[in-house]
Amino acid sequence: MTVGSQVVHDEPTILIAKLHALEPRLKDKNDHQARKECLRISKALTSQVEEPDNVAVSLAFSPVIALSARVAIDLNLFALVVQHGPVASASLAALSGAEELLIIRIMRLMSTAHLVEETAARTWSATRITKAMAREEIAAGHRFNSQVVVPAIQSAPDFFRENGYSCPTDTRKGLVQYALKTEQTAFDYIISNPSMLKDFNLFMGNAMGARKFWLDWFPVQSKILDGADPEKALIVDVGGGRGHDLIAFHKQFPNAGRLVVEDLPAVLEPLGEFSAFIEQVEHDFLSGEQPVKGARAYLCHHIMHDWPDSYCLRILEGIALAMTPGYSKLLLHEIIVPEQGACDFQAQSDITAMVCNGGMERTKQQFHTLLKAAGLSVVQIWESADEGGDGIVEAMKV
């Protein structure tokens, strides 16, 4: 079957035939490649049957979808539809306290965006996407993005025009600073706002969405557990926030070894029942050498994509100083952008990383170059089966 960039040039009838050919494979929930192909072909089919001018004009109005969804989240509309659907506009107005006319207009757009189902005039029911939108972790992401990412993106035309149309590399002179009129870095700005930090942490705990978690596909036994020194830390989660990864690891591999999560004091929070199994260490990964020496694995989950190359090099060099050659492994859990045929999520995440802190999503070659500069060598690059999913770059000290 033809996939990738070639598929967008096929005639609609050919694309429909390819979708039909996928039907037997889609019955197998474990055939992730079939799902990826189905999504790619479906998007290509949509682009072929829509009028080009309509697509171009709709794009100009597309920001209203996310912004209206943010209002719907503030009014708790998705949760109300899940709880009471099918539910009419009058009931939603009474339950939310908003004007009924506003409810009708917002929900009309949510329906056309397939976030809810319009089952009758001024009446909506929940779909599986509605249920996702009603989750607090996802609502937190929408709140955070509308306060930080959206203003930064809106400022992009002026910012790039004034800065010679080049990628930002100074974390104090980027799009967030330009848009929000602050001299703080994006992360300092977030930390200084408690409600924003809470939303950020909640959202990051759900950053994988429905994509497979790395513990489900990475060979933990052979790559981490086998040959591990019980006298040394097993995993150090660098910049690990509230410990999401290590909590999941402990649940799947209880008592496997010493687990350490590191982050800034303002980010670390009590781990409750897991505090007996996971150590917390205050550490700024930009400040210098890694404090936990000779661990089996140093995990960086969505760290590199937040930073320009020069900052990543500082982080990697600090970790490399603590690694034991031939034993310690560095695991970079990141989106790995293909040289051709990137999916929507990969491209969107790349631009988001750039506008937030001058970061980027990287290709295999970019990871090779970056790690080599830090005195590290790529052992293997593990790619997720999910569409737009993360991979893991496994590296060791040269």
UniProtKB/Swiss-Prot annotation:
GO terms for molecular function: O-methyltransferase activity. Pathway: Secondary metabolite biosynthesis; Alkaloid biosynthesis; Mycotoxin biosynthesis. The keyword ATP-binding does not apply. Its EC number is 2.1.1.-. Pfam families: Methyltransf_2. S-adenosyl-L-methionine binds at D263. O-methyltransferase; part of the gene cluster that mediates the biosynthesis of penigequinolones, potent insecticidal alkaloids that contain a highly modified 10-carbon prenyl group. The first stage is catalyzed by the nonribosomal peptide synthetase penN that condenses anthranilic acid and O-methyl-L-tyrosine to produce 4'-methoxycyclopeptin. 4'-methoxycyclopeptin is then converted to 4'-methoxydehydrocyclopeptin by the ketoglutarate-dependent dioxygenase penM through dehydrogenation to form a double bond between C-alpha and C-beta of the O-methyltyrosine side chain. Keywords: Methyltransferase, S-adenosyl-L-methionine, Transferase. PROSITE patterns: SAM_OMT_II (PS51683). InterPro entries: COMT-like (IPR016461), O_MeTrfase_dom (IPR001077), SAM-dependent_MTases_sf (IPR029063), WH-like_DNA-bd_sf (IPR036388), WH_DNA-bd_sf (IPR036390). It is an enzyme of class 2 (transferase). This is O-methyltransferase penC. PANTHER family: HYPOTHETICAL O-METHYLTRANSFERASE (EUROFUNG)-RELATED, PUTATIVE (AFU_ORTHOLOGUE AFUA_4G14580)-RELATED. The active site is at H305. The gene is penC. It comes from the Eukaryota. Belongs to the class I-like SAM-binding methyltransferase superfamily. Cation-independent O-methyltransferase family. GO terms for biological process: methylation; secondary metabolite biosynthetic process.
